[in-house]
């Protein structure tokens, strides 16, 4: 696939100050199709207003993982805008429309957004990569000069180390990395920067050193976890509103006999 000019991709970084969570709006300028990555329930009106003002049509919400610090707006956005909820294949989300395996993805107009499975912070983490625009959305797998914790939600320090090294640090050095959080006002980093400067996962660190670092952390229990995790397993909806999950990409691949699945729902969404 040939390179697509970056100017054809609309990009907005959105912020929730209560939980220091970043959400991301991406849209194809030609088709006006949009995705929201990690939308936050409390900002439903802000995000729908932005879509309306920019005359965009939300086709997908993409989750990087089952969050423990906020409740997603994905379910409410689906109810309001008929968007499709997309998660990683290992998240356990009960009512997603698509559960993507690594190496598959979704089409956004002229752009392709690839799912890279990056477990370790949780067992179902996904990094979303738009290679044509040199962008990757790492969730909590890789933060700016840090990473997500590995002491709950089936976290595993060794898996996280290998995920970052094999699926994020193998992206081109100039790839801009956008995390799910930052607590110091930083907004973006690059693969090259994190390889060099990340004190936990930089190339100077060994796997054993990383495991030791993560094991020594004494972090407080997330204050929203008991509400957020059960709600996010339902895409943020109340139990009565949850519906059965959609087909997994593994099933679609088996049916089509292909290793790459291109999902394009056109203008009917």
Predicted regions and their residues:
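Conserved beta-strand hairpin/beta-sheet module of binuclear metal-dependent hydrolase folds
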Residues: 2-57, 128-139, 145, 269
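Accessory terminal helices/loops
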Residues: 2-4, 162-176, 180-269
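Core dinuclear metal-dependent hydrolase active-site scaffold
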Residues: 13, 25, 105-131, 135
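Active-site HxH/HxHxD metal-binding segment of metal-dependent hydrolases
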Residues: 20, 41-117, 134, 197
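Divalent metal-coordination and catalytic microenvironments
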Residues: 26, 38, 65, 77, ...
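Short hydrophobic-aromatic micro-motifs
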Residues: 34-37, 113-115, 135-138, 179, ...
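Active-site metal-binding loops of divalent metal-dependent hydrolases
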Residues: 39, 66, 90-91, 121-122, ...
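A contiguous binding-surface segment within folded domains or other stable secondary-structure elements
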Residues: 125-162, 166-170
């Amino acid at each position: 696939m040939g390179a697509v000019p970056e100017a054809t991709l609309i990009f907005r970084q959105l912020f929730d100050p209560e939980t220091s969570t970043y959400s991301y709006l991406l849209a194809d300028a030609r088709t006006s199709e949009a995705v929201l990555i990690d939308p936050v329930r409390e900002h439903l009106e802000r995000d729908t207003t932005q879509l309306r003002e920019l005359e965009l049509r939300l086709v997908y919400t993409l989750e990087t993982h089952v969050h423990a610090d906020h409740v997603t707006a994905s379910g409410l956005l689906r109810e309001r805008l008929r968007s499709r909820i997309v998660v990683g294949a290992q998240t356990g989300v009960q009512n997603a429309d698509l559960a993507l395996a690594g190496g598959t993805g979704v089409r956004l107009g002229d752009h392709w957004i690839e799912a890279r499975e990056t477990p370790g912070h949780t067992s179902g983490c996904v990094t979303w990569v738009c290679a044509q625009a040199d962008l990757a959305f790492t969730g909590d797998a890789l933060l700016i000069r840090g990473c997500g914790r590995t002491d709950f939600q089936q976290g595993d320090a060794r898996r996280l180390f290998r995920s970052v090294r094999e699926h994020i640090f193998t992206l081109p050095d100039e790839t801009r990395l956008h995390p799910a959080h930052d607590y110091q006002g930083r907004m973006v980093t690059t693969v090259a920067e994190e390889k060099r400067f990340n004190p936990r996962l930089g190339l100077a660190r060994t796997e054993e050193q990383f495991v030791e670092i993560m094991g020594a952390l004494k972090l407080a229990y997330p204050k929203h976890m008991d509400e957020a995790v059960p709600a996010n397993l339902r895409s943020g909806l109340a139990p009565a509103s949850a519906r059965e999950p959609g087909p997994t990409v593994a099933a679609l691949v088996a049916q089509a006999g292909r290793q790459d699945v291109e999902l394009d729902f056109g203008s009917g969404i």
